[in-house]
Amino acid sequence: MPGFFSAAEIEPLRSACHADPTLGGALMALADSQGNAQEVVPYTEVSNDLVGVIPRLERVVTAAETLLGGAPYHRHSKLSMKQPGSAGTWDWHQDYGYWYHQGVLRPDMLTVAIAVDENTTENGCMSVVKASHKLGRIEHGRKGEASGVDQARLEQALKHLERVEWHLDAGDAVYFHCNLLHASGSNTSDRPRTIVHCSYNAVDNLPFLPGQEAHAYRPLAVVPDNAIVEGAWDTVFSNQIFISDDGDSGYGYKVLRAGTWANSQPPRMGVSAEL
């Protein structure tokens, strides 16, 4: 979806991320399979800061509802940042490979990836395997210091399906199914690569396992599409409640550095022990 966000809408977040690449200390570093740092910070609460308004914009929520075929709720969002020269990668995975183990019964879930910076091959854009969501959920497990999809099935998928890179301009967006195989590479450029992921679940598909309070249903206060340009937000992220510590590697990733954000949720993102 080219130009899903205008330059005027995306620039405040882009500028803030460039000015403070640790997001005030909120950003945590998770290990990839080779032990390299990959920086990310999730949040489930939606504030009146810019990062809390983005997942609630009418056009963002309406598209999610159309694709899901029913009412969605905000499961979580996250900022994923690759600084210039960072070696960290996201290994091949499906989001539902993890969310299934959090007690979500059906794969009626999706994510919209919103480019804050230009996303290129050189700075670590996302790669996907086209139509791989039709393969269903593939088992995930430990891969070095991280976790990822079963390698034998990944190899077969890559033999039969096309791998493509998502080259995005700032403000472009892509919605993708929770079973779509995706990954991203290192940033070998001198430019940062920041992307916002907003994930939604169907309201009749809540996780049933205990310990998932962070992903409980909360009514979504949708805001008009002009909320950002009209300045109907407080700060970019200063008041946002982030999850700055993933607990004990809840998604199967080793935590190299926990965030130190003052407004931080307890670590309640973990998956069941089967992963």
Q: What spans do the regions from the language model cover?
A:
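Non-heme Fe(II)-dependent double-stranded beta-helix
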Residues: M1-G103, G141, G211, A221, ...
